Amino acid sequence: MKRSGILNQPLSNILASFGHTDLLVVCDAGFPIPRDAQRVDLAIAPDLPDLRTVLSLINEEFITEKVVIAEEMAEFNPPLHGWLQKHFSGVEFERRPHEEMLTQVATSAKAIVRTGAFDPWGNIGLVSGVDVERFFAKEGTVLPDYYRDRAGEA
């Protein structure tokens, strides 16, 4: 038995399969998941599990290079928007029209994780990154400028 981390086997397997720039969508209970999408359905009841819990657990194991959200979220769900800004500080945010989140973003996802969240505009794209510090730790490798900020160097 695993001691810690995500215990759900399908979710753990999907996260382990991600490479650089792959897109994971973590969505609310009402998200129209495309028929052919690889999905993990965690929803049990309204807000069980909730979006913030699932995102927090994923964030402990997943390197997020970019967060994709609906541009309407800041206006119509400021608590969720603020929470995301806090928990994904230092990560690039891309804002897309809500309609694109339901269509283009959904069909671009390598996998979709459905929560029980009843959270307006609660559909979040996480673009997989790389561990910059580890990739460029070997002697003789040169850290490109565009990765310098991700590694926390000035």
Curated annotation (Swiss-Prot):
One GO molecular-function entry: intramolecular lyase activity
Subcellular location: Cytoplasm
GO CC list: cytosol
InterPro entries: D-ribose_pyranase, RbsD-like_sf, RbsD_FucU
Catalytic reaction list: beta-D-ribopyranose = beta-D-ribofuranose
Record pathway: Carbohydrate metabolism; D-ribose degradation; D-ribose 5-phosphate from beta-D-ribopyranose: step 1/2
Active-site residues from the entry: 20
E.C. numbers: 5.4.99.62
GO BP field: D-ribose catabolic process
Enzyme superclass (EC): isomerase
UniProt entry keywords in alphabetical sequence: Carbohydrate metabolism, Cytoplasm, Isomerase
Keyword Disulfide bond: no
Positions contributing to substrate binding: 28, 98, 121-123
Quaternary structure (record): Homodecamer.
Family: Belongs to the RbsD / FucU family. RbsD subfamily.
Function recorded in the entry: Catalyzes the interconversion of beta-pyran and beta-furan forms of D-ribose.
Protein name (record): D-ribose pyranase 2
Protein source organism: Rubrobacter xylanophilus (strain DSM 9941 / JCM 11954 / NBRC 16129 / PRD-1)
Lineage: Bacteria, Bacillati, Actinomycetota, Rubrobacteria, Rubrobacterales
